[in-house]
């Protein structure tokens, strides 16, 4: 195993040389794929088919009476889910142009999920409704650009209306209600999230893990969240969550950039000696040093991850020393005459688990001395009191919260791996929705906030008739969430929509779980404004783009034909890639 690490420098150079040879060889014999081009009505109609098929699969999950979707997987048992974005991500069509339309809807779902953490099904349903009407209008001779202007005008009006009606939430009961709704009516999950937020604060770090029992549990551990993610996606260990998860890792903290490949080899050898994963936090990891880490991760299956240090200047240095205190590490700093050439195991930090995403890193249960952590917290508190700068105070308070606040871990239990996976999807949605509700407030749920906002569009003035049609497209689309929720509950959606629009109480809605018309706020059926707003804005944006599309270019699939120049010798005499066969990975 040591030979793998120590030889990696020369292997990296060989790999780059071979890549260059391959590139020059391929450039001289490149094959260009033929393209299929479709125009106008035909192009939009084919994309619409993809949008409709994907939306039909996603919309059945909407609401408390939404149905399950079973997804075949290339490995393991089929996945059972009620999560809209999971369903959307799993769908690919054989027809290339259908797939273009579906891919753009998936972008809407992903964008909504990234910003608000929930509302993907609502965004998909709205996209389908807007694009369908947009296609019909353009086919009837309407000006596509005026339709787009009308759609934007209507969306801006609706967003303003929703913001004026939003109510901020503060109590634990209100937080539990939001979590319950987003978890498809699971009260236990809603209360668990409310308790976690109460424990670590609304800005605190809450993570979700597989439990080891049949029941859901809340555990609060000492931990820290770093606002930086992995330097390279090659460090990912869990493709499903797109995260790097390291159990019981060694933690190296370096104040400067790391570019010395020999120093990196020594660090890897120490981690291998202890048979433990490795987390590196430094200003940056560059060129050959980064290539060394990636090659060992991919070829030798060594669990390793590199993260850029958070902050800038003195603030970065302070953050690194905070992390060192939490994990019991020693910051490698040139000010003390330290470097990686004389590193030993006593300089590494330790913790129970590290989870790294593309945006942040969570360090759980650091092995630092409790007294040292307490003293550092007191030191930061003194600095807060002495500081006269609001900016400095804010940064110091952030550091204090990270050191002293802890991390809430939601351990999700179940009778089987399939059940735990499905519950984790719902808990993730509920947690994201709850954070969104705390951030921007809540509106009546069940789609009624959008439904009643459609009334505001009746009196909206436009520059011309085509823009008016654009406004009407949004007006009709805003009715689809209530319609879909009611239909999934087994009742006539059009009847429910009509009955709600006839009356004037803006909080009255249809409780699909009980089959009753109720005051949605009093019944605890609420939606985060951020989720609804993001879903509508993203849906309108992509639908407008699709409606104004006049041509679609896709590749015509061709059968693979072996090049006569390549022969059977592994790319024309490359000799097993110049010795790479002996890499031993």
From Swiss-Prot:
Chief localization class? mitochondrion
Q: Name one GO cellular component term.
A: chloroplast envelope
Q: Where are the transmembrane segments?
A: none
Q: Name one GO molecular function term.
A: RNA binding
Q: Can you supply a Gene Ontology BP term from the record?
A: protein refolding
Q: Which InterPro entries match?
A: Chaperonin_Cpn60_CS, Cpn60/GroEL, Cpn60/GroEL/TCP-1, GroEL-like_apical_dom_sf, GROEL-like_equatorial_sf, TCP-1-like_intermed_sf
Q: Where is the transit peptide?
A: 1-32
Subcellular location per the Swiss-Prot or TrEMBL entry: Mitochondrion
Which keywords belong to this entry? ATP-binding, Chaperone, Mitochondrion, Nucleotide-binding, Stress response, Transit peptide
Q: What does this protein do?
A: Implicated in mitochondrial protein import and macromolecular assembly. May facilitate the correct folding of imported proteins. May also prevent misfolding and promote the refolding and proper assembly of unfolded polypeptides generated under stress conditions in the mitochondrial matrix.
| Record-stated family | Belongs to the chaperonin (HSP60) family.
Q: What is this protein called?
A: Chaperonin CPN60-like 1, mitochondrial
């Amino acid at each position: 195993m040591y030979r793998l690490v120590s030889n990696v420098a020369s292997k990296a150079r060989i790999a780059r040389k071979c890549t260059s040879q391959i590139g020059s060889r391929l450039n001289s014999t490149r094959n260009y794929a033929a393209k299929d081009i479709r125009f106008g009505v035909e192009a939009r109609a084919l994309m619409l088919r993809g949008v409709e098929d994907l939306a039909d699969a996603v919309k059945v999950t909407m609401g408390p009476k939404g149905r399950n979707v079973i997804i075949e997987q290339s490995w393991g048992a089929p996945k059972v889910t009620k999560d809209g974005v999971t369903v959307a991500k799993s769908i690919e069509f054989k027809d290339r142009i259908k797939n273009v339309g579906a891919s753009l809807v998936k972008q809407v779902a992903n964008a909504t999920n990234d910003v608000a953490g929930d509302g993907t099904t609502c965004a998909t349903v709205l996209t389908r409704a807007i694009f369908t009407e947009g296609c019909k209008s353009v086919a009837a001779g309407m000006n596509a650009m005026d339709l787009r202007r009308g759609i934007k005008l209507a969306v801006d009006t609706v967003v303003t209306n929703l913001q004026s009606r939003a109510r901020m939430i503060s109590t634990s009961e209100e937080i539990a209600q939001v979590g319950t709704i987003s978890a498809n009516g699971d009260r236990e999950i809603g209360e668990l999230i409310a308790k976690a937020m109460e424990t670590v604060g609304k800005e605190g770090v809450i993570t979700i893990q597989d439990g080891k029992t049949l029941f859901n549990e809340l555990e609060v551990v000492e931990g820290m969240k770093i606002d930086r993610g992995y330097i390279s996606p090659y460090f990912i260990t869990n493709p499903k969550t797109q995260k790097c998860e390291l159990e019981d890792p060694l933690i190296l903290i370096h104040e400067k950039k790391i570019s010395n490949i020999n120093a990196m080899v020594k660090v890897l050898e120490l981690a291998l000696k202890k048979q433990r994963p490795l987390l590196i936090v430094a200003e940056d990891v560059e060129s050959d040093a980064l290539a060394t880490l990636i090659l060992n991760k991919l070829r030798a299956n060594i669990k390793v991850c590199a993260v850029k240090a958070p902050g800038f200047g003195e603030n970065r240095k302070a953050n690194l020393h905070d992390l060192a205190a939490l994990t019991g590490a020693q910051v490698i700093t040139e000010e003390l005459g330290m470097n990686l050439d004389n590193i030993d195991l006593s300089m590494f930090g330790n913790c129970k688990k590290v989870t790294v995403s593309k945006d942040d890193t969570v360090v759980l249960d650091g092995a630092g001395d409790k007294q040292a952590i307490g003293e550092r917290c007191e030191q930061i508190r003194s600095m807060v009191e002495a500081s006269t700068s609001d900016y400095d105070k804010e940064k110091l308070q952030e550091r204090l919260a990270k050191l002293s606040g802890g991390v809430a871990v939601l351990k999700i239990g179940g009778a089987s791996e399939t059940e735990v996976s499905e519950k984790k999807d719902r808990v993730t949605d509920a947690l994201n929705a709850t954070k969104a509700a705390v951030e921007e407030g809540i509106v009546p749920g069940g789609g009624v906030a959008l439904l009643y906002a459609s009334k505001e569009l009746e009196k909206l003035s436009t520059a011309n008739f085509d823009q008016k049609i654009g406004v009407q497209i949004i007006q009709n689309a805003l009715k689809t969430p209530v319609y879909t929720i009611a239909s999934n509950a087994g009742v006539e959606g059009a009847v429910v929509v009509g009955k709600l629009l006839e009356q004037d109480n803006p909080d009255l809605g249809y409780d699909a779980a009980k089959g009753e018309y109720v005051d949605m706020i009093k019944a605890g059926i609420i939606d985060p404004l951020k989720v609804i707003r993001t879903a509508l804005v993203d849906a309108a944006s992509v639908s407008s783009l699709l409606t104004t599309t006049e041509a679609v270019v896709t590749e015509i699939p061709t059968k693979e034909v072996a090049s006569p120049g390549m022969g059977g010798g592994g790319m024309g005499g490359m000799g097993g890639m110049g010795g790479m066969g002996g890499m031993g990975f």
